[in-house]
């Protein structure tokens, strides 16, 4: 029995490739699957997802490339399209509305997920909540806190190690915290670096994406 983890790549850099061309490129790089962004300007958009996602996913599989997850809207249409396409994870993030409290943002997300339980269970899909930086739920702890009372067969944790780096979170601790509900890890690397000072003399910090060894 093969217990090696599945390794996919976010297909964001190839928004206009056909299924055949995208498969050729990524299979040549050694990948067996992708995470597909559902966005305007890409192969599948929020408006076309019902018909376009099953079709595009089927074409990719015919060319030897799987779709392991999508990044898209959390709604019933998207969930059912994932189910029809055989895609197990719908990745999302919790963007914080600054006009309400953090807990109110979390409660809104939880209610949204609970209302979608029937569609999630019918479709065999998991909503994967990912950490992000800045104005989002930004740590492994915030992700686990948000999803903790939700059904584990319906909502899971996705950990992005680039954003743990930007937030100054230790990667090993972040993985340990998220592990009980973890469905996917995003492997990328980012750092903050000093970039001059402001008028008050405080250091300004910028960010950059770097190779894994840095």
Model-predicted regions and their roles:
Residues 13, 99, 103, 208-212:
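The substrate-binding groove and active-site-proximal loops of carbohydrate-active enzymes
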Residues 2-7, 25-32:
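A short, Lys/Arg-enriched amphipathic alpha-helix followed by its capping loop at the start of a domain
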Residues 20-24, 59-62, 66-157, 166:
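Active-site acidic/histidine proton-transfer and metal-coordination neighborhood
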Residues 1-19, 37, 71:
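Boundary/entry segment of secreted carbohydrate-active catalytic domains
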Residues 9, 36, 70, 92, ...:
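Conserved beta-strand positions
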Residues 35-57, 61, 100-101:
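Glycine-rich, proline-tolerant flexible connector loops at the mouths of alpha/beta enzymes
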Residues 118-214:
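Acidic/histidine-rich catalytic cores of soluble enzymes
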């Amino acid at each position: 029995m093969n217990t090696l983890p599945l390794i996919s790549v976010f297909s964001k850099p190839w928004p206009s490739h056909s299924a055949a061309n995208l498969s050729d490129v990524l299979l040549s790089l050694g990948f067996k699957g992708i995470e597909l962004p559902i966005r305007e300007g890409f192969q599948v958009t929020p408006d076309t997802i019902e018909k376009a996602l099953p079709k595009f996913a089927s074409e990719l599989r015919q060319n030897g490339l799987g779709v392991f997850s999508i990044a898209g809207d959390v709604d019933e249409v998207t969930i059912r399209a994932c189910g029809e396409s055989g895609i197990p994870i719908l990745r999302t993030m919790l963007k914080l509305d600054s006009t309400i409290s953090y807990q109110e943002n979390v409660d809104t997300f939880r209610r949204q997920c609970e209302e979608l339980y029937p569609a999630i269970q019918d479709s065999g899909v998991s909503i994967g909540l990912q950490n992000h930086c800045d104005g989002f739920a930004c740590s492994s702890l915030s992700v686990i806190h948000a999803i903790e009372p939700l059904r584990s067969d319906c909502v899971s944790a996705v950990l992005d190690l680039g954003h743990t780096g930007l937030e100054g979170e230790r990667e090993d601790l972040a993985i340990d915290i998220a592990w009980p509900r973890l469905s996917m890890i995003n492997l990328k690397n980012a750092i903050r670096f000093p970039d001059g000072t402001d008028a008050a003399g405080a250091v300004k910090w910028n960010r950059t994406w770097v190779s894994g060894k840095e």
